[in-house]
Amino acid sequence: MSGIALQGIRCHACRNAAFRSFAAISGLSSSIRRPQSSISYPGSKLYQRNVRTTGRRQFSTLGSVKSQVDSDLPTKTETKEDASAESSHIPWYLQDESHKPSSHPLKQQELPPLPENPPPILENLLQYISVDAGLDDLALLDLRGLDPPPALGANLIMIIGTARSVKHLNVSGDRLCRWLRSNYQLRPIADGLLGRNELKIKLRRRARKAKATGDASSLNSRDDGITTGWICVNVGDVENGPLKTKNSQDRNFIGFGGTEDKVRIVVQMLVEEKRSELQLEALWGSLLNPEAGEMNPAPRDDIWGNLSSETTSSRKGVDSIASTFSQRFPGRRHIHTQARPDTLEPLSHEILGNIVQESRPALPSKIVSTSMASPSVSSLLEQLSQLPEEEARRELGLGPGDRDSTLFLRLFYEAVSKSDTETVLIDKLSFARAAVLLKHPAYSKTDLYRAFKSMAASGCDISEELAMDTVRTLLSFQGPENAANERVPEQDIDLALRVLEHMSLRGIKIFNGEVFFLLHKASAFQSHVLPANDAPGATNTPADPDSISKVPVEELDHITTVHNRLSKLMASANVDFDYKDYPELLKMYFEHGNYSNFWRLWHRIPLMQIPRTKELYLLMFRLHAKLGHQRQAVDCLSSWVPMMAREQPPVALDEELTRDIMACMLVADPAIDQKTDDGTVSQFTRLWKQCLRDLKSFKAANSQ
């Protein structure tokens, strides 16, 4: 086959058929079957009846519509077709296809039946959507009886239709909005709709790019703003039909405003691929008929990902959770008005038990029951917190699946079994937090996040304090204190951000100083670090070189970029840190080489009407002495030692502050002690002599 012929065969099915025909001529057997393009929608038969109209359609579907296979076809015909397709060697262009039945195009144009008490506009709207707009496979969902109402509004009627292409989708949405405005004086809102000129401009730009690259298929993988595939037209509030029930005034009403019987109509217009992906009919159909969903349970995607309690490694669990969120909800927020039920099943324990040594010395348990009755969960956790860390980790057993290896676990799960569902979820979340804070090797932050999402998915009321405790635990360091080059993993930060996002959806204010402080701290190293290319020299000699580790410059630049972005976000949100966090922030900025942010925060403290106390000056002098940078030590001493007397209130010198100033002077001028003895005059000799006199007076005062 020539290259021109291969270029002409763009369709995947045509390429397979051509390959099958040439393979048949050459005597090879091919098992490639022609792909079927019929897609079934589980919720599209909620309202169906016979064809109500066969009017002339402005968007003809006779040439481009995908045929669907009728359910009443005999199985013998399908078996015979498959057998003949596999055994026959007749080329595809010579095969007789007259015996293959095809569904009538009007099957996709059936109008759904009207619900009870339909609004007067509904029948004309369905007629226009099907005949004039040209949407196929219409489905009508009557959501007026849902309690609580959907997020789109109460008394909702939803119409779902399929467009043939993205261009057809935008043209149909635009014409529908114009038709509603001109005929019914409504003001529809179309989310995802591109205007006529905007659509033409984007299509023209895409055509130019495809022509320049010479390959139009390379642009299909990018989101250019045209391939959304979904337009939601909110028709607005319309008059409702006559009610056959008792008068609406007899119904109890709680809230503000009056009781209105208007109906809100929403038209969901999607391309075929987007409709099969979202499955809106199945989602709303399960809410309309929950009994059917219980009788025929099917796997579904949850907003919190997979709720199974399988215990795996921390990295694997985090990756699976992140992939579920990124694929199903890329960069969007979704509002749910009904809680999803969650089954409380014991966590399985298979892999994590190998992390902990199975052979342990049999030590007596320090957890005791203080009364004949079972102790409460709060008292058990309180006793656990009072134990040494090693003994407390021993009381937690082998992992999440262990329930009876220690006395604490037996008492804990016995107390949990007597509580209601909400209390059980809160207790399990507190237990997971305690295990992570104790740095038990078999309990990971992924287990803590699973406990939180189980509580959130069950619809329990999560307090702000409980959610913030979870965020603090997720953003905590797991290694020993001042461990070299330790940072909070990005997976743990991602889990904390998901908890914060859930808090925001629940109306909790997450833009506060504590949240930004935790994010600043989690994105940095736990200990003092220096760039790897910053070798100690005459002007940069750390006081304790072993306590300062070297890291690549790129990592420090990345941390600085993250801190700068967080600072800009705080400025735009008009949020500031809490004063108690200032010393740790100053230390973190300085130890990561972010001196600009250090001095910016240092100068901002008095502007906020907050005095710079002795503790802040002690921190500044100690950081410069530990860094060992001569030039920075000189600038610090010359600028801020005189400034101490000008503070409001003034910072008085004492023995501790004097020693830190002298340590900083030894960095600025290592030979200052010898220069003072020799009588040589230098920049800091006078200050050095004053510090010596002050130390003598302090010692004399202490001796008395």
Swiss-Prot record:
Region (Disordered): 57-118
Places the protein is found: Mitochondrion inner membrane
UniProt keyword annotation of Mitochondrion present: yes
Keyword field: Membrane, Mitochondrion, Mitochondrion inner membrane, Transit peptide
Bias kind Basic and acidic residues: ranges: 73-83
GO biological process: mitochondrial gene expression; mRNA stabilization
Family indicated by similarity: Belongs to the ATP25 family.
Protein name, UniProt field: ATPase synthesis protein 25, mitochondrial
Encoding gene (name): ATP25
